[in-house]
Design a protein with these regions (language model features):
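Helix-to-loop junctions at the C-terminal end of transmembrane segments
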Residues: 54-66, 254-266, 351
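Juxtamembrane intracellular "pre-TM" segments in multi-pass secondary transporters
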Residues: 1-2, 179-210, 391
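Helix-loop boundary and gating motifs at the non-cytosolic
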Residues: 1-48, 206-211, 215-229, 233
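C-terminal ends and interior cores of transmembrane alpha-helices
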Residues: 76-89, 277-289
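C-terminal membrane-cytosol helix-exit motif in multi-pass small-molecule transporters
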Residues: 164-185, 370-378
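Cytoplasmic helix-loop-helix junction between adjacent transmembrane helices
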Residues: 99-136, 315
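Core transmembrane helices of Major Facilitator Superfamily
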Residues: 19, 100-112, 300-312
Length: 391
């Protein structure tokens, strides 16, 4: 665990601190450029699209260079994207920066997950991965608070500069650990081909993978629903950032209990309730008209997201093949990111009519997703420490 703390958890905390400051601001930044709510929601689509590319690239790069070196490259891309957003006053270059942020973050995510999985036993897998996810959540709680302070002092763009500095600090912390110097043996080329991995894992990908894609859509939508609705009812930028912090604060309290429940009773005990709670929070938002109501909905979203901490990573680790594991994890992340692309895209498309319509559709999708997870998550066998695959 000491090795994970220095090479994984500390750099992750620093990087996610900056990301937490930026995530609530993508849509708000586009709105400040005098674009519509539909275009603002599309910023989350661009971010998710960048993540899809980063997931595919991150799995292959991690297999070739090892997870630590791949993480350094991902962090460099993430910092570069934050700088681009900080200096871009118009839409197109700003969205390019958002895409680069998504690309670098996903590449880093795949690399970090691979390292944790390689260092822990299966019986402790959920707790190790939820601790990683919990590190993100703690940083995502503090990040919006610091972001709100930076915005109040220096304006919206300064938050992106702050994020770039925290990611650079993560690079320094990772390079200070001894693990980055170790380069693994080069794997066989056949292990690196995404098509081979997809073909051999198709029974899992077309069932549980579909449920993961839907979960990604519901979770990603929560990033845009709060700022868009808050803007529509006249809330300030700093108030939105503070509400995000409240949601993240609830979120971060649940990661370790969620991991313990997964390791003892199975993955479905967190995945299904988590998705239902996110659906409930999304469905509640259109019925709110002030900060108190938005905060209540945000707390529901935070509880749901926190209770599902690390579950998608854990499911991917459970079903990943021995050969081509890094590439499979990248493919698994692509499914999550495809969902992350679909959720905000759905809201963006429906926002042309009314925001509430998009929220109701996403909330209904969350209920369907919970049923899919209940159906396809493999039965848990604690005596085997791993779930059995289902036909």
């Amino acid at each position: 665990m000491r090795a994970l703390a220095t090479s994984t958890y500390v750099p992750t905390f620093l990087a996610e601190l900056g990301l937490g400051a930026m995530l609530p601001l993508f849509a708000l930044s586009v709105l400040r450029m005098d674009h519509s709510a539909a275009v603002a929601a599309a910023s989350a689509v661009i971010y998710a699209g960048g993540r899809m590319g980063g997931s595919a690239w991150g799995g292959s790069l991690s297999a070739r260079l090892g997870p630590v070196r791949a993480a350094l490259v991902g962090l460099a891309a993430l910092a570069g994207g934050a700088v681009v957003c900080a200096v871009s006053p118009v839409l197109v270059p700003f969205l390019a920066g958002v895409a680069l942020i998504g690309f670098g973050h996903a590449g880093y995510h795949v690399a970090r997950q691979g390292q944790v999985e390689s260092l822990v036993l299966a019986v402790f897998r959920a707790r190790a991965l939820t601790t990683l996810a919990g590190t993100w959540r703690i940083a995502n709680f503090i990040g919006p608070l610091l972001g709100a302070a930076v915005i109040a002092a220096w304006g919206l763009r300064a938050a992106y500069a702050f994020a770039a500095l925290t990611v650079v600090a993560a690079i320094v912390a990772l390079r200070a650990s001894s693990s980055w110097r170790r380069r693994p043996p080069r794997p066989a080329r056949s292990e690196l081909r995404h098509l081979d991995v997809i073909r051999s894992s198709w029974p899992i990908l077309r069932t549980l993978g579909l449920a993961v894609l839907l979960t990604g859509a519901v979770r990603a939508a929560r990033i845009v629903v709060i700022p868009l609705w808050a803007e529509s009812i006249g809330m300030s930028d700093s108030a939105v950032s503070l509400i995000f912090a409240v949601s993240a604060g609830v979120d971060m309290l649940l990661f370790y209990p969620a991991g313990a429940v997964m390791d003892r009773w199975g993955r479905a005990w967190t995945a299904v309730p988590s998705t239902l709670l996110i659906a409930a929070g999304t469905l509640l938002l259109p019925f709110t008209s002030g900060p108190t109501g938005v905060a209540i909905a945000a707390v529901l979203l935070g509880v749901g997201n926190g209770w599902g901490s690390g579950v998608l990573m854990t499911l991917g680790a459970d079903v990943a093949p021995v050969h081509g594991r890094d590439v499979f994890i990248g493919t698994w992340m692509i499914l999550q990111d495809a969902g992350g692309l679909a959720g905000p895209a759905l809201i963006s498309g429906l926002a042309a009519m009314t925001l509430s319509t998009g929220f109701f559709v996403v909330g209904g999708l969350g209920i369907v997703t919970a049923g899919a997870l209940w159906r396809w998550i493999p039965p848990w066998r604690p005596e085997r420490h791993l779930p059995h695959a289902v036909d």
